[in-house]
Amino acid sequence: MQKEKVNIKKNDKVKVVAGKDKGKIGKVLSVNREKNRLVVENINMIKRHTRPNVSNRQGGIIEREAPIDRSNVMLMCGKCVTPVRIKMKELEDGRKVRMCGKCKELID
């Protein structure tokens, strides 16, 4: 089975298009390319129960972001301000850059 390419990078602005957080916009905090999952700021929040230990004396319930599948988010274009599909374009100098599928604006 061929691995899908993750064209979304850290610090990109994305919109959730499926799941319990559908319609929310956030910034990508980390990308796991092996599992095709992203951690997005304030999206897919879960609660973790922690025991008291040396670094966290009190313990308790901590709320944090959980990974979300890459297929459930779309990149937000800075120019047309909508969620878009990403196309790859090769420049004259040989570099490959990401491009907005609607307005053809370069993202990188």
Curated annotation (Swiss-Prot):
Gene3D superfamilies per the UniProt record, alphabetical: 2.30.30.30
Cysteines paired by S-S bonds: none
GO CC terms, sorted: ribonucleoprotein complex; ribosome
Assigned keywords, A-Z: Ribonucleoprotein, Ribosomal protein, RNA-binding, rRNA-binding
Single biological process term from Gene Ontology: translation
Top-level taxonomic group: Bacteria
Molecular function via GO: rRNA binding; structural constituent of ribosome
NCBIfam families (alphabetical): rplX_bact
Family, per entry: Belongs to the universal ribosomal protein uL24 family.
Function: One of two assembly initiator proteins, it binds directly to the 5'-end of the 23S rRNA, where it nucleates assembly of the 50S subunit.
The protein's assembly and partners: Part of the 50S ribosomal subunit.
Name by which UniProt lists this protein: Large ribosomal subunit protein uL24
Protein species of origin: Desulfosudis oleivorans (strain DSM 6200 / JCM 39069 / Hxd3) (Desulfococcus oleovorans)
Lineage: Bacteria, Pseudomonadati, Thermodesulfobacteriota, Desulfobacteria, Desulfobacterales
Gene that encodes it: rplX
